[in-house]
Amino acid sequence: MKEIKVIIAGPRGRMGHEAVLLMERTEHFNLVAAVDYKHGGEKISDLPGMPALDTPIYGDLHTCLEEVEADVLLDLTTPEVGKQHVTLAVERGLRSVIGTTGFTEEELKQLTETAKEKAVGTIIAPNFAIGAVLMMKFSQMAAKYFQDVEVIELHHDQKLDAPSGTAVKTVELIRQNRESKQQGHPNEVEQLEGARGANVDGIHIHSVRLPGLIAHQEVMFGGDGQMLTVRHDSFNRASFMSGVKLSIETVMNLDHLVYGLENIID
């Protein structure tokens, strides 16, 4: 396979660290630069626990793009920074794979239009784990037969956004196969505000944040005398790397924006 030159934004994070290791062990990936505002001017090898790579680190993406030629930006930063980075990448005509979440419908619409106008491949993935993508697909299938459903997502306590992008995407897919319905008793009252979680078209989403967790989600469907639970667990960040690899390889052949890994797997 032809060499793919990659910039990683957010190499110090746990996902970023796994992504650097992915670059090192994948023959056709070439990590040409990294972006980290705290370590501009250093090299990847200067960061604790990183492999001995001479890859330069830039303090901001704008400067990096001025000096480095790349094929793909892999962004694993925070929601706010990720939004800035993907906007800049699309405007510059640089393909990007975005692993941050928190995009609004309006932001996605604008990015989709710009990516189409610029004919630049872009993938925004709420979850890179193939198993999580299958969980979403299975939930979408089940929604045709079970109208009563709630979502519980559980993540580490350093996650900034709630609910997770995976939970939001799951509900979007479920709604495609489910008529609008308010889940629960029509006269139910929350004795404590937020006790029933977020409500999206009658589907309740509950977010758990605790140390010791990585990324987990279960979708619970209830019916007369039965219950169906679809669950996925990521026990470490290595579970996301197959999806990252697939996304980087796939985005090279795209000329538009794709939201969700489920849209690039068979």
UniProtKB/Swiss-Prot annotation:
<keyword id="KW-0520">NAD</keyword>
<comment type="function">
    <text>Catalyzes the conversion of 4-hydroxy-tetrahydrodipicolinate (HTPA) to tetrahydrodipicolinate.</text>
</comment>
<keyword id="KW-0457">Lysine biosynthesis</keyword>
<dbReference type="Pfam" id="PF01113">
    <property type="entry name" value="DapB_N"/>
</dbReference>
<feature type="binding site">
    <location>
        <begin position="99"/>
        <end position="101"/>
    </location>
    <ligand>
        <name>NAD(+)</name>
    </ligand>
</feature>
<dbReference type="GO" id="GO:0016726">
    <property type="term" value="F:oxidoreductase activity, acting on CH or CH2 groups, NAD or NADP as acceptor"/>
</dbReference>
<feature type="binding site">
    <location>
        <begin position="125"/>
        <end position="128"/>
    </location>
    <ligand>
        <name>NAD(+)</name>
    </ligand>
</feature>
<keyword id="KW-0963">Cytoplasm</keyword>
<keyword id="KW-0028">Amino-acid biosynthesis</keyword>
<comment type="similarity">
    <text>Belongs to the DapB family.</text>
</comment>
<dbReference type="GO" id="GO:0008839">
    <property type="term" value="F:4-hydroxy-tetrahydrodipicolinate reductase"/>
</dbReference>
<comment type="pathway">
    <text>Amino-acid biosynthesis; L-lysine biosynthesis via DAP pathway; (S)-tetrahydrodipicolinate from L-aspartate: step 4/4.</text>
</comment>
<dbReference type="InterPro" id="IPR036291">
    <property type="entry name" value="NAD(P)-bd_dom_sf"/>
</dbReference>
<dbReference type="InterPro" id="IPR022664">
    <property type="entry name" value="DapB_N_CS"/>
</dbReference>
<dbReference type="GO" id="GO:0050661">
    <property type="term" value="F:NADP binding"/>
</dbReference>
<dbReference type="GO" id="GO:0051287">
    <property type="term" value="F:NAD binding"/>
</dbReference>
<keyword id="KW-0220">Diaminopimelate biosynthesis</keyword>
<dbReference type="Pfam" id="PF05173">
    <property type="entry name" value="DapB_C"/>
</dbReference>
<feature type="binding site">
    <location>
        <position position="156"/>
    </location>
    <ligand>
        <name>(S)-2,3,4,5-tetrahydrodipicolinate</name>
    </ligand>
</feature>
<feature type="active site" description="Proton donor/acceptor">
    <location>
        <position position="155"/>
    </location>
</feature>
<protein>
    <recommendedName>
        <fullName>4-hydroxy-tetrahydrodipicolinate reductase</fullName>
        <ecNumber>1.17.1.8</ecNumber>
    </recommendedName>
</protein>
<feature type="active site" description="Proton donor">
    <location>
        <position position="159"/>
    </location>
</feature>
<dbReference type="GO" id="GO:0019877">
    <property type="term" value="P:diaminopimelate biosynthetic process"/>
</dbReference>
<feature type="binding site">
    <location>
        <begin position="165"/>
        <end position="166"/>
    </location>
    <ligand>
        <name>(S)-2,3,4,5-tetrahydrodipicolinate</name>
    </ligand>
</feature>
<dbReference type="InterPro" id="IPR000846">
    <property type="entry name" value="DapB_N"/>
</dbReference>
<keyword id="KW-0560">Oxidoreductase</keyword>
<dbReference type="GO" id="GO:0005829">
    <property type="term" value="C:cytosol"/>
</dbReference>
<keyword id="KW-0521">NADP</keyword>
<feature type="binding site">
    <location>
        <begin position="10"/>
        <end position="15"/>
    </location>
    <ligand>
        <name>NAD(+)</name>
    </ligand>
</feature>
<dbReference type="InterPro" id="IPR023940">
    <property type="entry name" value="DHDPR_bac"/>
</dbReference>
<dbReference type="InterPro" id="IPR022663">
    <property type="entry name" value="DapB_C"/>
</dbReference>
<feature type="binding site">
    <location>
        <position position="38"/>
    </location>
    <ligand>
        <name>NADP(+)</name>
    </ligand>
</feature>
<dbReference type="GO" id="GO:0009089">
    <property type="term" value="P:lysine biosynthetic process via diaminopimelate"/>
</dbReference>
